[in-house]
Amino acid sequence: MSGTGLWLVGARGSVATTAVVGLLALRAKLVEPVGCVTERAEFTGVPLPGWEDIVVGGHDVVHTPLEKRAEQLADAGLIPHRVLAATATGLRAVDARIRDGYHPATHTGAQADAVARLVEDITAFRSSHGLDRVVVVNVSSTEPPVPHVVEHDELDLLEAALADPARAVLPPSSLMAYAALSAGCAFVDFTPSPGIRLPALHALAVAKGVPYAGSDGKTGETLLRTVLAPMFTARALRVRSWAGTNLLGGGDGANLADPAQARGKLESKARGLAALLGEGVTAPLHIDNVPDLGEQKTAWDHVSFEGFLGARMSLQLTWTGLDSALAAPLILDLTRLTAAAHAAGRSGPLSELAFFFKDPVGTDEHRFAQQTELLTDWARNLSHPQPASYPQPTGDNPEPTPPTDRMARRDAPGNGWGLHRGRASDERSGSSS
């Protein structure tokens, strides 16, 4: 067996489509790897899969063909038309590997039945393509937070509830995480949805000996905050308030126009700033849907701070970007790094991947410089496989059994050129800034 699978949950959304087009373009050497962190010199020698080693499939509840979605993104200025033309055949091949996702409104029977189908889809994909492993990445629509129930804490109780046709104990993102872990696959949550962040799912990951990472990809406004906030702290300047407004269109804007859907996103953004500056900073944050913006996203921030002798000053900044173009290369980076971690015997939360997330699992470190150092140091150590186990919140776990197969070493930054509803589908369905 050889190769790595990338299984996208929300495979026909903007982020997923951009990632697939980008992967195909990198493989064909049509574009440079701009925005791909794992192509930096610091990752030379890290045993990462090459672009040509990655095979893509996925789930989605939307049926718009991948090529059609890519055409829409090209018309929006996100994908060059020459790249679209050159990757059309590859897009059709990936589209043929996308299966129907789980939707609670259309599913009948117990959630365990849905899990069995999802697991079969993933394992059949892994087997038919002779893959060493599959990384499942959630780029589906942002979900609202869910009420806590005791089944979220205990794996045996969760499994019993999943078998009950009268209950829907897991939201779609967490059901997909459960299916991925059950299939022996690593899981990455690029959304602020509940997803992997349940104690019972942590226990399942450790029992299966697979790693997971998340949550909520950091691509725009929050990225700037994690760079700038430590500057104020290091210079002993007192931040009094940090107000932010996000303007966005497309499916992302429509999805987050619902206050319930936006709640998880706002909470994810707020946690990082509070961790960096403390709870005493006034930090109102708004997300507004502006359909005219399409795929573009604009963030306005106003920072009020106090200096020596009480001098009042402010910083204002504007960030305008194409979110899918910022997120897509990170999806490819996370696939490579998580696959390498799995091959090296890592299991449980990959806190070292905090660099990529607004609300990272397994760590409270939000300072971007420290996250960068943590990531590069950790990646270099992946050359030396070692099993790792992580304790459950309520007790000890058995040592996981690491995989025995190994990935080919990547010897140079340029080596390996060959290479639910989508985040965002607009069908744009997730959000990452």
Could you say what each language-model-derived stretch is?
Residues M1-A183, F187, P199-A203, D323, ...:
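Metallocofactor- and cofactor-centric catalytic cores in central/energy metabolism, strongly enriched
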Residues W7-G10, V210, E221-S351:
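Active-site-lining helix/loop region of Rossmann-like oxidoreductase modules
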Residues R27-L48, V188, L198-A254, R263:
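Catalytic or ion-translocation cores adjacent to nucleophile or general acid/base/metal-coordination motifs
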Residues E143-P145, P194-I196, G220-E221:
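Short, small-residue-enriched loops and turns at beta-alpha junctions
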Residues D156-A163, V206-Y212, A311-L315:
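Glycine/charged-rich beta-loop-alpha catalytic/anionic-binding loops adjacent to active sites
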Residues P387-S433:
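Actinobacteria-biased recognition of intrinsically disordered, low-complexity terminal regions
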